[in-house]
Amino acid sequence: MSRHINTFLIVLTAAVLGGCRNYLNVQPQGEVIPSTDEEFASIIHNRLREIEGGGDEYVIGNMDALKHLEGCADDLDANIKTSASLTFFAGEEITARQRAYEDSWEIVRDCNIVIENLSGRDSDIAKGSLSAAYAMKGIIYYNLIREFCQPWSDTDADELPGIPLVDRFSISDKPSRGTLRQSYDYASAQFESALALDPTDPKYIFTTWIVKAYEAKLDFWCCKWDKVISLCEDIISNSGISLTPIGEYAAMINSQYERKGEVLVRSHINNSSELDWYFSFTKGYLASRPACAALIRLFGDEPKKDVRYEASFDKKRMNVKTPECKVRLSEIYLMLAEAYCHTGQTQKSLDLLNELRRNRIEGVVDYTESTLPSVREGDRIVVDCYGNALTPLMQAIFDERRKEMYMEGDRWYELKRNGRPVWWVISNGLKYTTDSYLYTSPISKSDVDLNPSLIQNPGYVY
């Protein structure tokens, strides 16, 4: 649960969290340690129900996760309007991000319990639960790498601090942080273990193509372009999912509960979730700040020809797009287009970009190398993930990504991945600067206090 839901449900949440923290020490209270496949499966299904109901912030994510990410990024213009209900500065979120670090480990703990006890069992329940446990653990590590590690660097990955590599939990263990490269390898191994079990049962959510999509996202973040190309080509060619066409886009992107069209996976598919009342407030918070002019300008002189425009904004530039965390085929296209661009396969990159645009913009004319818009001056992102100045093709990919992934929690990580630009917001006469170090959240201070071998991230001194 988020800190906001905790405020409303403090008594219930305290009881739940109390139970979570004592999960590995239940015998003194007279509880029964799980032993059967069904009992271990229930641990996984509790986590899957959180995803379906919208309560999960740390695997697929929910509206609370989006509220943090979209509030701290620059797609919404905090210089025009700020409010207490919607964050506008990452520095305000330091305590909440430490709590996110702690809560993520509770999910890893549950996954490890299932992995340790169901490995080698051959029932359908055991294999389904085990594959879901590996998949969720891999996704958690991917999310921890994005949030709590510095951006990927091929030259520094063996020295940069990563995430503790935890196969099992013990009260006496105090694991230190692995390197960034070790963390990538560990997360990748979780996805491979999930895929080795041939996950096909949708009731465990994380079926083959969904696992491959998250593995591609991990490889994309860590600049493994050959792997990105292999995985994304496989998904596009063999998953049976295709880009949602213009006429069906609005219904797909603003579906309240259903997974429609090109969506591989999304949160909050339970239309009787007990959290719906809370999310109605969250939607209002996200619609309380107008989109920034730089984003709106990307839609050109005739913005309504781009189906994404009216599906995202009202006449006052306020958000109307349904804020749900999801993975869509359009993201796979964009990752593949960028991977081709980084590997010098310009025409393949252009072909993918043009195919996406034809499914979004009425009457659009395909780009060629000679007709790509020149690189603009004054944009926030001016370099790619290697620190190289943007080319017209890379800028075009970034522009489509910004329009396509608006209000899906992507922009903050694009800023982090591509240069960590420093920028500021004025509120109530004060200047709030997003410095480069703020793109990487601090690991939990309480963890550092308990385990001095844990290295805190740069910029945070307690």
Describe each PLM feature range.
Residues 20-67, 232, 350, 420-462:
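Membrane-proximal, proline-rich intrinsically disordered regions
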Residues 223, 227-330, 362-384, 394-396, ...:
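Hydrophobic-face positions in mid-chain alpha helices that act as interaction patches
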Residues 1-20:
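Sec-dependent bacterial lipoprotein signal peptides
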Residues 79-148, 178-179, 191-202, 227, ...:
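Conserved, well-structured interaction surfaces
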Residues 147-186:
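Short coil/linker segments at helix-helix boundaries
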Residues 198-229, 233:
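Aromatic- and glycine-enriched pocket-lining scaffold segments that form the walls
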